[in-house]
Each structure stands twice: as structure tokens, then as C-alpha cells.
């Protein structure tokens, strides 16, 4: 793995949650609550805030990653503040790395994708690794994107694999029979 900048020792990190399309807000909030309960037990965690179905306050990192656009019921995140770096034995990266598997396990139980997002040591980027797929038709682009996603998933040290392919939310259409409804 090529690394351009060393890991920093920041005072915070973020847990970004993507539930399946169409998930009710209450389910997203419940998942965030369970993730938050795990984090609250950690001695390095000073406090945390949860945001379900609404964007968290804009940070420089979030601005570049467009987290301010996250407003769907199936989207949530946790802003996690750590105790001062002089009052903890582990650096923020080590803490995030240690907690990631436990957080992902909770996410899996709720059918959620969970990403632990650290504040970068340098200028923020969309993601540490980005692959853009171009092609003449949507179906071909999506098929190639899914193959790339699978390859990334199977590569050691690549975590938080995601695509920008939007999942179709289930829909229900109701046809009101006005005559019956009035009676």
C-alpha cells in the first residue's frame, strides 16, 4: 500500500452509516444508537453526537466529501470526539483501526455499511483511493464499478469500499378510490 502522508494524531473521527435504500429514519437512528453505545464505553472517547437523516455540521473534510448533502432517512453519522492526545496511550488512527471491526460487525447486523472516517493529515480528499469509471452506457459502467468494488473488497488493507451507484428504494403506490373513501 502506497502512503503519501503519515497518520496524524487527531482529536476526532467520524463514523458514516449507509442503511439500505428505503430504511425508515427510526431504524437508522437505532443503528446509530447501538454504534454510539459501543463507542461511549471506550475510555478514549470524550463525547459523540449522532445525526440520522440529516447532515452533521460541516467540517473541511466533510465539505470535500460532500457530507452536507446527506439528508436521506437511510443515512447517518456519528461525530466522535477523543480525549486530549496527552491523556491517551493510543493515537487516533490506532483507535479508529481497533474499533473499525467492532463497528462493522454492528453494521452488518443491521444490514448497514459502516465507514470509519479519519481526519486526514493533509488536505482532505474524496477518499484515500478513488476509481472513476467511464464508458458509453450506464449498465456497462455499473457492471465494471461492481467488479472493481469486489476487487477492492478482496484486497488487504483497503477498508470502507463504497460506490456512488444509487440503490433503488422500494416504493408503494396507493390508488385511492374516492367514492369508497368518502363513504
What residue spans do the PLM features occupy?
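Solvent-exposed, membrane-proximal periplasmic/extracellular interface segments of envelope transport
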Residues: 1, 27-123, 150, 179-183
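Transmembrane helices with small-residue packing motifs
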Residues: 1-23, 59, 63-65, 128
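Extracytoplasmic
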Residues: 10-14, 43-47, 73-77, 109-111, ...
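Conserved hydrophobic/aromatic pocket- or pore-lining residues that grip, position, or stack substrates
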Residues: 15, 131, 152
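Solvent-exposed beta-strand sheet faces enriched in polar/charged residues
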Residues: 16, 49-51, 115-117, 164, ...
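Short beta-strand-to-loop capping motifs
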Residues: 17-19, 80-84, 133-136, 176
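Beta-strand-rich non-transmembrane domains
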Residues: 137, 142-183
Amino acid at each position: 500500500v502506497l502512503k503519501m502522508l503519515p497518520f496524524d494524531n487527531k482529536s476526532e473521527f467520524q463514523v458514516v452509516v449507509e442503511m439500505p435504500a428505503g430504511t425508515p429514519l427510526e431504524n437508522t437512528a437505532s443503528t446509530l444508537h447501538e454504534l454510539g453505545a459501543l463507542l461511549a464505553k471506550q475510555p478514549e472517547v470524550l463525547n459523540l453526537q449522532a445525526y440520522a437523516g440529516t447532515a452533521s455540521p460541516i467540517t473541511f473534510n466533510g465539505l470535500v466529501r460532500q457530507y452536507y448533502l446527506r439528508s436521506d432517512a437511510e443515512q447517518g453519522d456519528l461525530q466522535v470526539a477523543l480525549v486530549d492526545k496527552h491523556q491517551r496511550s493510543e493515537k487516533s488512527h490506532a483507535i479508529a483501526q481497533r474499533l473499525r471491526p467492532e463497528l462493522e460487525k454492528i453494521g452488518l447486523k443491521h444490514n448497514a455499511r459502516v465507514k470509519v472516517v479519519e481526519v486526514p493529515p493533509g488536505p482532505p480528499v474524496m477518499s484515500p483511493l478513488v476509481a472513476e469509471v467511464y464508458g458509453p452506457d450506464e449498465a456497462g459502467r455499473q457492471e465494471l464499478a461492481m467488479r472493481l468494488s469486489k476487487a477492492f473488497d478482496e484486497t488487504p488493507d483497503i477498508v470502507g469500499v463504497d460506490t456512488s451507484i444509487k440503490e433503488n428504494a422500494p416504493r408503494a403506490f396507493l390508488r385511492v378510490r374516492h367514492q369508497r373513501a368518502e363513504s
